[in-house]
């Protein structure tokens, strides 16, 4: 490998722990999810790296370094030899914990500035795909978390309701809607309990499928009276943390238009 004087540098935050993120660099099935069918990686020093892009374009590489949950380094080049042959550039992926989950730092070193510049958009796109693929796995159970949120609002026993919210939400969870300005589990649970005292028997339920992108979930809902009549509908936006618990929720009710 010759001199690599030109660097492409990019950092992104992923809604997952470093251990989870690193699996997508060590498991070929996960590797192929964000690179494409047929792609594979052998996550040990000297292991082979294969990326199969659309149109049959193949990238080949060799793993140079592996530090579990922290760092992986591999060579990168095109099987055809153009624009760069195998072994002629180097990719370093570093992971570190952050508030969102994991900060991924990519450094791709090239022998020529023009080749580096040609890869800027490719990595911008590929890391965007990566963030979504990882979060799809992390938040695969988001529907049960959201359903648990709606169900907790109907629990009249204080201790049971506290436990239900604690199971699905962070201690410092925030909730905002037209009738709520709440911070923390205790505030949230007390507010939900009060809603049952003033509107006994009212229940919330999810309507339809969730929509999800990188830890942000949209859920439509319906509020029903004790006799089963539908009273109101709306949409909640949930922000989930790297452990798939609710960090914040914002509710939008479909209120009648003012006359």
Q: Which residues make up each language-model segment?
A:
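Residue-level recognition of conserved beta-strand positions in structured domain cores
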Residues: 53, 76, 106-108, 177, ...
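A beta-strand edge to alpha-helix "cap/lid" segment located at domain peripheries
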Residues: 81-133, 195-259
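A solvent-exposed, acidic/Ser-Thr-rich amphipathic alpha-helical stretch
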Residues: 18, 37-52, 59-61, 67, ...
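Short acidic-aromatic low-complexity motifs
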Residues: 15-19, 141-168
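Short, highly charged C-terminal tails/helix-capping segments
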Residues: 132-141
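Hydrophobic ligand-binding cavity/cleft-lining segments
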Residues: 1-40, 142, 148
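Short, solvent-exposed secondary-structure boundary/capping segments
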Residues: 70-77
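Hydrophobic pocket/interface hotspot
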Residues: 21, 31, 49, 63, ...
